[in-house]
C-alpha cells in the first residue's frame, strides 16, 4: 500500500517553520565556518569561476546602500522582521498550498538568517563568489540563495495559478 503525504491543515505552521529553521541553521553554520576559516577579503578558488571569499555587506542585495551612515542596519532589520510577520500570517492562512508555503518558508529562513547577521555582527556575512574572468557577481550567502529560490518558486506558483484560472 502506497503512503501519501497529507497536506498540512490550513493554520499548521510547524512544517513550514521547520523548513525555515533548516535554512537558518545551514546559513548560520556556513557563516560560522567561513568566519573561523577566512580572514576578511581572503579568497580561495574552488573552480575557474567560483571562489569562497569573506566579505561584509552593510547594505542590501548587490551592496545597495552599503555606504550609508549606519541607519540601513536597523532599516533592513525592521524590514526583515516585518516580512517575517507577513509571511507567518500568510503561512497560517495558506498552509494547505504546498508550493506557495515552501516558497514563503525559504524566503522566511533566508530573511531571518540575514536579520541574525545584522543583529549579531552589524552586517551580513557573504562568501559565495561567482565570476567570469575579472567580472565578479556580488558575493552572497545561503540565506540569499534561499530567498532567491523562494522568490522563483513563488513566481512559478503564481504563474501556474493564473494559467489554471483561465
From Swiss-Prot:
Catalytic residue list: 126, 144
Pfam family, one: Peptidase_A8
Protein's cellular compartments: Cell inner membrane
The keyword Cell membrane is assigned to this record: yes
Catalytic activity field: Release of signal peptides from bacterial membrane prolipoproteins. Hydrolyzes -Xaa-Yaa-Zaa-|-(S,diacylglyceryl)Cys-, in which Xaa is hydrophobic (preferably Leu), and Yaa (Ala or Ser) and Zaa (Gly or Ala) have small, neutral side chains
Keywords: Aspartyl protease, Cell inner membrane, Cell membrane, Hydrolase, Membrane, Protease, Transmembrane, Transmembrane helix
The protein's Enzyme Commission number: 3.4.23.36
Transmembrane segments: 9-29, 45-65, 71-91, 100-120, 135-155
Single annotated GO MF: aspartic-type endopeptidase activity
One Gene Ontology biological process: proteolysis
Topological relation to the membrane, as annotated: Multi-pass membrane protein
InterPro entries per record: Peptidase_A8
GO cellular component term, pick one: plasma membrane
Pathway(s) served: Protein modification; lipoprotein biosynthesis (signal peptide cleavage)
UniProt family annotation: Belongs to the peptidase A8 family.
Functional description taken from the UniProt entry: This protein specifically catalyzes the removal of signal peptides from prolipoproteins.
Protein name: Lipoprotein signal peptidase
Organism the protein comes from: Burkholderia cenocepacia (strain HI2424)
Biological classification of the source: Bacteria, Pseudomonadati, Pseudomonadota, Betaproteobacteria, Burkholderiales
Amino acid at each position: 500500500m502506497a503512503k501519501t503525504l497529507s497536506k498540512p491543515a490550513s493554520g499548521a505552521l510547524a512544517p513550514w517553520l521547520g523548513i525555515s529553521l533548516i535554512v537558518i541553521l545551514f546559513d548560520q553554520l556556513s557563516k560560522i565556518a567561513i568566519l573561523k576559516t577566512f580572514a576578511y577579503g581572503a579568497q580561495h578558488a574552488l573552480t575557474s569561476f567560483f571562489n569562497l571569499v569573506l566579505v561584509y555587506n552593510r547594505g542590501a542585495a548587490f551592496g545597495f546602500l552599503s555606504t550609508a551612515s549606519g541607519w540601513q542596519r536597523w532599516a533592513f532589520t525592521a524590514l526583515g522582521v516585518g516580512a517575517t510577520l507577513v509571511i507567518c500570517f500568510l503561512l497560517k492562512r495558506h498552509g494547505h498550498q504546498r508550493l506557495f508555503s515552501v516558497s514563503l518558508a525559504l524566503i522566511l529562513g533566508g530573511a531571518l538568517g540575514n536579520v541574525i547577521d545584522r543583529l549579531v555582527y552589524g552586517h551580513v556575512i557573504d562568501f559565495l563568489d561567482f565570476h567570469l574572468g575579472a567580472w565578479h557577481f556580488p558575493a552572497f550567502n545561503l540565506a540569499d540563495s534561499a530567498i532567491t529560490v523562494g522568490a522563483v518558486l513563488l513566481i512559478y506558483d503564481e504563474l501556474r495559478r493564473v494559467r489554471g484560472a483561465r
